[in-house]
Amino acid sequence: MLCCMRRTKQVEKNEDGDQKIEQDGIKPEDKAHKAATKIQASFRGHITRKKLKGEKKADAPASESEAADKKDEGPAGGAAENKESEASAATEASAADSAQLDEGSKDSSVPAEEKKGNGAADTGSEQPAPQAATPAASSEEKPAAAAETESATKASTDNSPSLKADEAQDKEEPKQADVPAADTTATTTPAAEDATAKATAQPQMETVESSQTEEKTDAVEETKPTESAQQEEVKEEESKADQENA
C-alpha cells in the first residue's frame, strides 16, 4: 500500500510540473539558453568597453600632443607677430628720421650757401696780404737751402778717404777667404776620388760575381737534362738486349 501511495504522489507531482510549464509557456531548456545568451552578451559588452577604454587612452596622448603643439605654435605665432610689428614700427621710425634729416639738410643748405658767399667776400679782401708776404719768405728759404747743400758736400768729401779705405779692406777679406777654401778643396779631392772609386768598384765586383754564379747555375741545369737523357738511353738499350736474349 505504501509503495502505491508513493508512486501515485510522484505522478501527481510530475503532473503539477507539466501544468506549470504549460501555464508559463517556457521550458527549462529555453531558460538555460536565455541565461547563456545573457552571459555572452555581458561578456561581449565587457570586451567592447575595454576596447573603448584603450582607444580613449590612445587618443588622450594624441590630444595632449596636439594641445602642446598648439601651445608651442601660439607663442611662436605671437613672437612672429611681435617681430612684424616691431619691423613695421622700425621702418616707420626710419622713414620719419630720414624725412627730418632731409628737412634739416635743406634748412642747413641755405645758411651754408650764405656763409660761402660771405666767406668768398672775406677771402677776396684778405688775399693780397699773403701774396705780398710769400716773396720775402721764399728769398729767406733759398740761402738756407744753399748752406745745407754746401755742408753736406763738404762732409761727403771729408769722409771719402775713409770710405775708400773701408772698401779696400772689404775687397781684400773676400780674397783671403777664397784662397783657403781653394786649398781645402784641393786637399779633399784625392780622398773623395778614392772613396768614389771604391764605391763604383764594389757594385761592379758584385755584378760580376752574380753573373758568374748565374752562369754556373745555368751550366749545371743544362748538364742535368743531358745526363738524364743518357741514363734513359742506356736503360732502353739494356731492355732491348734483354728482350733479344729472351
UniProtKB/Swiss-Prot annotation:
Region (Disordered) residue spans: 1-246
Membrane association type: Peripheral membrane protein
GO biological process, one term: axon regeneration
One Pfam family cited in the UniProt record for this chain: Neuromodulin
Domain of life: Eukaryota
Any GO MF annotation of the entry: phosphatidylserine binding
Compositional bias segments (type: Basic and acidic residues): 9-33, 164-176, 213-225, 237-246
CDD domains with a match to the protein in the record: IQCD
Biased amino acid composition, Low complexity: 87-99, 125-157, 177-203
Keyword tags: Calmodulin-binding, Cell membrane, Cell projection, Developmental protein, Differentiation, Growth regulation, Lipoprotein, Membrane, Neurogenesis, Palmitate, Phosphoprotein, Synapse
UniProt xrefs under SMART domains: IQ
Family to which this protein belongs: Belongs to the neuromodulin family.
Protein name: Neuromodulin
The organism of origin for this protein: Gallus gallus
Lineage summary: Eukaryota, Metazoa, Chordata, Craniata, Vertebrata
